[in-house]
Amino acid sequence: VVQSHRRDDRAEVAHISSADTIYKIDSDIDPILIDFCNDWSKSTPLVLVAEGLADENGIEGPRVFPCGMKIEDAEIQVIVDPIDGTRGIMYDKRSAWSLAGVAPNRGAATRLREIEVSVMTELPTSKAGRADVLSAIRGQGVVCRRVDLRDQSIEHFHPQTSSATSIDHGFASVSNFFPGTKLLASELMEFIVARLIGRADVTRATVFDDQY
């Protein structure tokens, strides 16, 4: 993904799925993901759930590995968003994230709360020097690593939750990335601020907004 910043075609539309617009930078990941699942399924039959993914017949939906296996016979479901934040990273504007989770396969009854292993990996911009990787196994806590992109050295760190008791002098956001939702989102943000700290004083600007 970092190397793709040098290409001019990464922002081209590859196709329109039922869930979103799929760009070239997204579709370039699919063959890599499919090859990985083909190899993994030799030892662990799995169901891959990913946005815009289609089966051999071009039908969007979960894909079973190895090919030909019934979905109910797979051991696990792998839920993946290879690039969460496509639009920011494809213009080299800000980091995106690669998200993955693994849950026991219960077919259509499988729920996100049943995920046993999860990994969140930063996909940095071309000018970044380091990238964060956060992973967790149910019952075993979280492992956080910061990878130096120059020499692949790793530094461990421990994220902490904020101790703030108010949103005053802090960030508060209602995501509204696309036109069509901005008016409602703005009204909701104003309502939240008014309920939590009272009417916002624009001369003080004590509540900050950051869509990312």
Language model regions located:
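N-terminal subdomain of lithium-sensitive/metallo-dependent phosphomonoesterases centered on the IMPase/IPPase/PAP
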Residues: 1-83, 208-211
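Alpha-helix capping and helix-coil boundary motifs
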Residues: 17, 108-111, 166
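An extended, acidic
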Residues: 2, 115-117, 121-212
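Short amphipathic alpha-helical surface micro-motifs
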Residues: 28-31, 79-84, 116, 150-157
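Short, flexible, glycine/charge-rich loop motifs used to bind or transfer phosphoryl groups or to couple energy/partner
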Residues: 66-68, 108, 160-162
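Alpha-helix termini
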Residues: 4-5, 38-45, 104-110, 125-126, ...
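DPxDG-like acidic metal-binding loop motif
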Residues: 71-139
